[in-house]
């Protein structure tokens, strides 16, 4: 099954990495193009085929030197619930399953693959004063 990808999400991901945010992708899917795209955007922690997302997230946070109460996590389906409940800020795209929408702190107005990651990263960077830059937001 092919996943859709947003160029705006991609821009925000690479911009966040350039601004020093630590990003990770933990997916139950095994689609290598997801890994290639994320690595191409600068994400170093890309984990596919993750059956236990909370375990992966905990390991990644440890490697990054942060605790789960410093993590924002976006998920859209039942396998994300434990991870969503363990972090500081839980969010989901508006087309997530009802159980996830009910469990999160923030339902992002965009659908998955249509700018929801951009919205989260843009808000996080604006809060830190990192969204505007003299670099002109270059790729």
Q: What does each of the following model-derived ranges do?
A:
Residues 1-6, 45-47, 54-139:
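Mg2+-dependent phosphoryl-transfer enzymes with acidic/Ser/Thr/Gly-rich catalytic loops
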Residues 1-55, 139:
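Alpha-helical substrate-recognition element adjacent to the catalytic core
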